[in-house]
């Protein structure tokens, strides 16, 4: 589960932190008996509480998609991509040459430990890479040299330095072009449970569905469906797929989408509707509404995340969807019944209905943009004059929190 994500000098962002820590002074009365997740308790301390949902509001071009893209870039580094194609600095800010670098710092909980991975890079090289576990440094690479290893890894210092030199650093200019983490995982796959946990988390435990396709093609419907069907363990492949389809249709019906059956194969998607006479009529998927097509893809990934406890980040969650449907998608992550594995949702929204229906101030951020400050994220719970009785939807629409456009023609 993500606790925070810090971004420096990336596209429209100069400095921004997405903070998912539950920051109310105390938990509400009766929260343990509530049907809804108020927070996830990831450790014994109050500081180990994180929210199940974080929704970001903001005007067009304020940088909402940039946050998801930044996470995609960190994911790409973990998969072996280099800095040349991943360096996307803020071109509108007056940053000094020394500050012409991007930094990502991700804090997340895994196996009841708090991990913090920090990566700084420019167009030519990875400048700094560091991994901490519960506040202690596991390893640190700075300007192409290993500067710190914890006690259990220090015995491999010479081997690690040689691996770094041979597999991550260009000899002629000493530029580090590959992240150290996946290389160590490759050469020493079982050397540290913490290294394995972090690498697996960065590669597999964060699902990103973004409108920005500059780095990746979006997941196809069949890829989304295969992810979902594989969560039905202990079943034969065909039986698992049938059960996944059945649950998908049932959930869509619960969201008031009138589809009686679905067929998802490599050759395409077919939907079935019942006629006025009760007969089943098959349709090609392209004939469905944009809302239905959008929902099916999102819903497959949401159901997958809920079944296995992943974190999912969705750009424009409410795109082409009725506000009440968008509310229910958010509510799925707050439901203890539907989300028993502590899955997290981070999403961008335009529709304000969830502010009245399902989102708390701790679960809401507002993004504003200016050329001087770049994209600035304000967490609603940190606004000084906010009262617990305030209507968040009304106050946001009125402009009290910023993050709204001021159109005039």
Residue ranges and their predicted role:
Residues 1-78, 271-404:
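Switch/communication elements of ASCE P-loop NTPase nucleotide-binding domains
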Residues 147-169, 230-231, 240, 320-332, ...:
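Short flexible/disordered coil segments
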Residues 158-191, 325-326, 332-337, 341-344, ...:
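Amphipathic, soluble alpha/beta structural segments
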């Amino acid at each position: 589960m993500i606790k925070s994500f810090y971004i420096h000098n990336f596209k429209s962002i100069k400095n921004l932190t997405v903070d998912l820590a539950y920051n109310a002074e105390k938990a509400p009365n009766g929260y343990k008996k509530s049907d809804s997740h108020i927070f996830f308790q990831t450790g014994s301390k109050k500081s180990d509480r994180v929210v199940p949902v974080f929704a970001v509001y903001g005007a067009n071009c304020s940088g909402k998609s940039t946050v998801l893209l930044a996470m995609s870039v960190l994911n790409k580094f973990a998969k072996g991509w280099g800095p040349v194609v991943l360096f996307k600095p803020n071109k509108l800010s007056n940053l000094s040459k020394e500050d012409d670098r991007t930094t990502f710092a991700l804090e997340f909980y895994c196996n009841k430990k708090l991990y913090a991975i920090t990566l700084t890079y420019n167009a030519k090289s990875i400048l700094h890479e560091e991994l901490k576990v519960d506040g202690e440094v596991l390893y640190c690479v700075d300007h192409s040299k290993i500067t710190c290893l914890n006690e259990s890894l220090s015995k491999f210092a010479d081997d690690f330095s040689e691996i770094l030199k041979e597999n991550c650093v260009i000899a002629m200019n000493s530029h580090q072009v590959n992240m150290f983490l996946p290389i160590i995982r490759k050469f020493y796959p079982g050397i540290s449970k913490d290294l394995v946990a972090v690498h697996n988390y960065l590669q597999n435990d964060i699902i990103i569905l973004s409108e920005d396709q500059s780095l990746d093609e979006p997941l196809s419907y069949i890829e989304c469906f295969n992810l979902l069907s594989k969560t039905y363990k202990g079943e034969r492949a065909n039986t698992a797929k049938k059960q996944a389809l059945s649950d998908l249709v049932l959930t869509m019906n619960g969201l008031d989408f009138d589809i009686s059956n679905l067929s998802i194969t490599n050759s395409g998607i077919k939907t079935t509707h019942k006629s006025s006479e009760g007969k089943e009529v098959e349709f090609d998927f392209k004939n469905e509404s944009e809302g239905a097509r959008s929902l099916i893809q999102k819903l497959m990934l949401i159901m997958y995340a809920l079944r296995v406890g992943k974190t999912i980040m969705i750009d424009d969650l409410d795109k082409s969807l009725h506000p009440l449907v968008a509310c229910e998608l958010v509510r799925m992550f707050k439901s203890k019944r539907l989300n028993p594995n502590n899955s997290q949702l981070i999403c961008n929204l335009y529709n304000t209905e969830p502010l009245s229906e399902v989102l708390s101030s701790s679960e809401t951020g507002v993004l504003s943009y200016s050329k001087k400050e770049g994209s600035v994220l304000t967490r609603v719970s940190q606004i000084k004059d906010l009262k617990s009785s305030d209507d968040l939807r009304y106050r946001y629409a009125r402009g009290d929190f910023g993050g709204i456009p001021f159109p005039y023609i």
